[in-house]
């Protein structure tokens, strides 16, 4: 069985996965046709006692790709004006290239094998990240192609809430609804929420697992 220091490391906690919190703001629901307008990422780290906490934050306003659909209802919902020059928007390639570079370094520094997206209703964010990476021909995508950690599902289990604002408030995390639907704000709050869910499970005695070494070896042999 791994010693305590390994179980307190990020690589030991999530089976070699490096969790990165992602939130995207978009001009619709179709990842293939609708514009990615904003993306933020928060990397995570463990302290020496195995408590999860936010680490580095990245944030980009993104230029719509050529031919992208801009759904008026989506723009009204998130309040983004894609034509506003004050956004300081960058290309999809530049935004994802920088995020991927930081994530790959984190994977290496933390001794992990691959990154995994953490997001609220994660299928949505994962699909837009994957579609943008494909459009930009970014072949070294560090994120798992389909697995995610979904804080909506985890919050439903732990807190009885699935809406981000309600889950945060129930968990004792402040949430300013006037800042919601900003990728930067939502990512930061989702990161705090995920850390609280993971740390709460630890405080309740759910981690580390009380398994014998032989049981872990048997499971590893089956993988």
Swiss-Prot record:
Cofactor section: Mg(2+)
Chain segments annotated as transmembrane: none
GO CC annotation: cytosol
Keywords: Exonuclease, Hydrolase, Magnesium, Metal-binding, Nuclease, tRNA processing
UniProt xrefs under InterPro entries: Exonuclease_RNaseT/DNA_pol3, RNase_T, RNaseH-like_sf, RNaseH_sf
Domain Exonuclease: 20-194
Active site residues per record: 181 (proton donor/acceptor)
Listed SMART domains: EXOIII
EC numbers for this chain: 3.1.13.-
GO MF annotations in UniProt: 3'-5' exonuclease activity; magnesium ion binding; nucleic acid binding; RNA exonuclease activity, producing 5'-phosphomonoesters
GO biological process: DNA replication proofreading; tRNA processing
EC category: hydrolase
Binding site for Mg(2+) 2: 23, 25, 181, 186
Cofactor annotation remark: Binds two Mg(2+) per subunit. The active form of the enzyme binds two Mg(2+) ions in its active site. The first Mg(2+) forms only one salt bridge with the protein.
Site entry (Important for substrate binding and specificity), positions: 29, 77, 124, 146
Binding of Mg(2+) 1, residues: 23
Pfam families linked to this entry: RNase_T
Subunit structure: Homodimer.
Its biological purpose: Trims short 3' overhangs of a variety of RNA species, leaving a one or two nucleotide 3' overhang. Responsible for the end-turnover of tRNA: specifically removes the terminal AMP residue from uncharged tRNA (tRNA-C-C-A). Also appears to be involved in tRNA biosynthesis.
Family: Belongs to the RNase T family.
Protein name per Swiss-Prot or TrEMBL: Ribonuclease T
Organism: Pectobacterium atrosepticum (strain SCRI 1043 / ATCC BAA-672)
